Amino acid sequence: MFQFVYWLRALAAILITNSHYADIWPASAMAFGGHYGNCIYFFLSGFCLYNIGKSFPKWYAKRIVRVYPALWIVAVVNLAVKFWSADGIMAYIHCFIYPTWYHFISSIMILYLIYYIIRVIQKKTGISLLWFLIAVLAVYLLMYAFLCDKSRYHIDDVGEHWCRFQFLASMLVGAYFRERYDRIGAKITVPDIVGFFVLAAAYFAGKIALSRIHEVSGFQFILPIIQVLLVGSTAVLFVKAEKKGVFERTSALIR
């Protein structure tokens, strides 16, 4: 069940890997899609973790066990070959615990907590996930209006914390898809396809414009919203493809 998860995860891995190939491709602009791939991963986290049945300590401990051992292996290797350096206890805490050298881990470990709280509240109150999405959007826009430096384009810089709003929103969209999965039909419609290409074009055109035209940096708040919508649009196509049996037939051919 949910074979689309594996295919969507593969797409995310390809996009993220490709984003690190700026020095390999003939043109650095070809190394795109990293943030798109990150948001897909967060979408999948929200989708797969929808059913919360454990107490928070047990649930969070399971997340730690799934995330940190791989990090520790990588950290030990990188420190051993001196690709990384650590001087003092705080440097080792940075490498092995938080925030680590990988923005994804520091973000996901914080957002797991927020996601758990939201799901618990939702289960007890029956409030639609859409309202939580709207609340996240409202907080994001409010903080952007008063706290964000609008003089330069940096809204999706993984070195800053602004990207966590779209990561959290992607998780909630994933949870919403899990909640509504059985209601999604198998027919891929023209609006589904057109919507995907329009959002993809808007997203990449927006990134190019913000990167090259300094005067439009004040409108950068729109880009993360388009990004989350694009992830949702992508998921619609993948879920419907799964329900049409596309992935099952493809897997059979591969085997």
Each model region followed by its residue ranges:
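Membrane-cytosol interface segments of multi-pass membrane proteins
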Residues: 1-152, 184-197, 240, 244-250
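Residue-level recognition of alpha-helix termini/interfacial anchor residues
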Residues: 4, 11, 167, 177-184, ...
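Short, aromatic-rich membrane-interface segments at the entry and exit
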Residues: 28-31, 127-130, 163-164, 215-223
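Alpha-helical transmembrane segments of multi-pass integral membrane proteins
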Residues: 35, 80, 84, 91, ...
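Loop-centered beta-sheet repeat module
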Residues: 132-180
